[in-house]
Amino acid sequence: YVVDRNVTQKDNFMEIGGERKTVQLPSCRVLKLTQPPVVWKQKKEGIVEAERMFSFGEVPLEVTAGDSLQQGSFSYAGDMEAFMSMTSVGDTLLVTFDFPEDKLEQHLQNDIWIRVRSEGMELRLPAEVQAVVVDVEDMEANFYGLRCDTLSFRTRYLARLEDCHVTALAAQAQSLHFNSGTVRNLYLNLDEIADWDVNTGSFHIDTEHLSGSRY
């Protein structure tokens, strides 16, 4: 199948502003940012088309350590709250972004590919968090200043690590960049990674545990 991502010629940006808001996060072991799955339909023979897709390529996410009390928080443009919800399921906190048609501006209601534009989000991790999942279309995740024994993360798009020091790290992203920091044991499944690089002048890895169909 060929996926048709053509956009209309008119402006298909969804601007979300408002006064910046910060909310405290409950204790959790897994923190997942997500959006409802895309519904695909047959457009014509050999081509499938999304009913509607929302790209967060212009809403970067910074993931950092919690405050001095190791409490977690989430910061974002205030108007984003109308399109997000937080729910706890077991030891997992779900932050879901959803854009129902009745909340879309008129000029966007016929668009298939809508690009969300807003100020960057900041996620400060609660002390107990062991896994971060960013299952959001095109969202860049920048991990900064983390100090922990064990962490795993999975992002749908791009991830960068700056000044992160982790004993055991399992990482997965389409594009993965280790810019500065240290990892004693790094676990990668290369079948799930399109490209990755390590700045050897400022990032040190003791042992790489590589898996995938070629290993």
Task: Describe the predicted segments one by one.
Residues 164-215:
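Short, surface-exposed interaction patches in beta-rich subdomains
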